[in-house]
From Swiss-Prot:
Family (UniProt): Belongs to the RRF family.
Source organism (scientific name): Flavobacterium johnsoniae (strain ATCC 17061 / DSM 2064 / JCM 8514 / BCRC 14874 / CCUG 350202 / NBRC 14942 / NCIMB 11054 / UW101)
Function of the molecule: Responsible for the release of ribosomes from messenger RNA at the termination of protein biosynthesis. May increase the efficiency of translation by recycling ribosomes from one round of translation to another.
GO biological process terms held by the UniProt record: translational termination
Gene Ontology CC annotations of this record: cytoplasm
Statement: the UniProt record of this protein carries the keyword Cell membrane: no
Compartment(s) of residence: Cytoplasm
Gene3D superfamilies membership: 3.30.1360.40, Ribosome-recycling factor (1.10.132.20)
Species classification: Bacteria, Pseudomonadati, Bacteroidota, Flavobacteriia, Flavobacteriales
Name of the protein: Ribosome-recycling factor
Keywords, ordered alphabetically: Cytoplasm, Protein biosynthesis
Keyword Cytoplasm tagged: yes
Amino acid sequence: MTEEIDFILESTEESMNGSIAHLEKEFLNIRAGKASPAMLGGVFVDYYGSATPLSQVSKISVPDARTITLQPFEKNMLQAIEKAILIANIGFNPMNNGDVIIISVPPLTEERRRDLAKQAKSEAEDAKIGIRNVRKDANTDIKKLEKEGTSEDICKSAEEEVQNLTNTYIKKIDELLAAKEAEIMKV
């Protein structure tokens, strides 16, 4: 195959890997019962006018499977942190005792588990759409090369290779989704 085709295939695989990495990151934000600092990964606090990740303004610890504690580096940040957690709408009700913020992680109800599974499916579908868009872009680039004089056979085999990559990554997404759903539904 030509250098251009090799480049298209490499960048296609790289982009598809990026979609998988993004999906894995999104799945980390979907909690499945046990308390973890990652549950607060998407929470940003207004810190002197700029949105700052919670982990940069407080020490996050998990003393047991149902509790997360936040020790702000500055006491005056307690209200801002509490407000940010409520605004993030992640299903937590923070308690401020004047020194630390304590979050009790409630056990998941069957309804909440179904909602989380639905959210995981939605994230997986978004990742699949991303993979298909990468495939479409790669095939467009290959067609462009064909019009510029690259052999039709080379272009056809490149398109088949792109389709094989697409199938592989879609299968990987389905496997990640099945694992996440099993984790969510496990009582």
